[in-house]
């Protein structure tokens, strides 16, 4: 989010820039989530991602309502932050070997996105409140609640299913101990020497 530009001279400027930022973010997520859904092999994870795709599409529509309430046309501002997070997620998935490890990587990538969104929505709500834009706060708060709920569901799936499956596979394959048993030669014990008592 490129906040430090000459065009941003007031809190209202910051708010509108942030709104365009999150609008871009949500649209990028709509484009990227199908790849995660296709790659996921855990049934619960796939189901949760599909549900969140529908939520994200609805979040885009809510943001368009926010623009409309503010008398502006919906438009996005390219966000290097989310571009970097999504690229890192793609690279992580491309380098992961094994179905269960892939599911864990998907959760990690998805939660990185969720945490970014949660931060952005929290900031926008605070700015909207300060600027007296109360009419848009409920829409932003609804999006924030959904992001927090999605993050919580991802954590639950990871703890109950995905991470356990990945760790079990690691123990069976790549998680073997690298310590070698050292064979030691038997220690020869010296027989005690009988000493004569001095008479």
Per-range role (PLM):
Residues 1-199:
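Amphipathic alpha-helical hairpins
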């Amino acid at each position: 989010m490129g906040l430090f530009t000459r065009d941003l001279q007031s809190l209202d400027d910051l708010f509108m820039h942030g709104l365009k930022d999150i609008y871009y973010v949500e649209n990028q997520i709509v484009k990227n989530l199908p790849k995660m859904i296709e790659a996921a092999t855990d049934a619960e994870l796939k189901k949760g991602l599909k549900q969140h795709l529908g939520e994200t599409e609805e979040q885009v529509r809510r943001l368009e309502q926010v623009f409309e309430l503010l008398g502006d046309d919906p438009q996005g501002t390219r966000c290097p932050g989310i571009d970097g997070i999504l690229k890192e997620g793609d690279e992580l998935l491309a380098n992961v070997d094994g179905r269960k490890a892939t599911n864990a990587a998907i959760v990690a990538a998805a939660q990185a996105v969720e945490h970014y969104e949660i931060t952005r929505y929290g900031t926008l709500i605070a700015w909207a409140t300060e600027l007296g834009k109360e009419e848009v706060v409920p829409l932003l708060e609804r999006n924030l609640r959904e992001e927090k709920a999605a993050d919580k569901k991802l954590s639950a799936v990871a703890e109950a299913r995905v991470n356990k499956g990945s760790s079990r596979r690691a123990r069976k394959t790549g998680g073997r101990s690298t310590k070698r048993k050292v064979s030691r030669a038997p220690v020869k014990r010296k027989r005690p020497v009988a000493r004569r008592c001095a008479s």
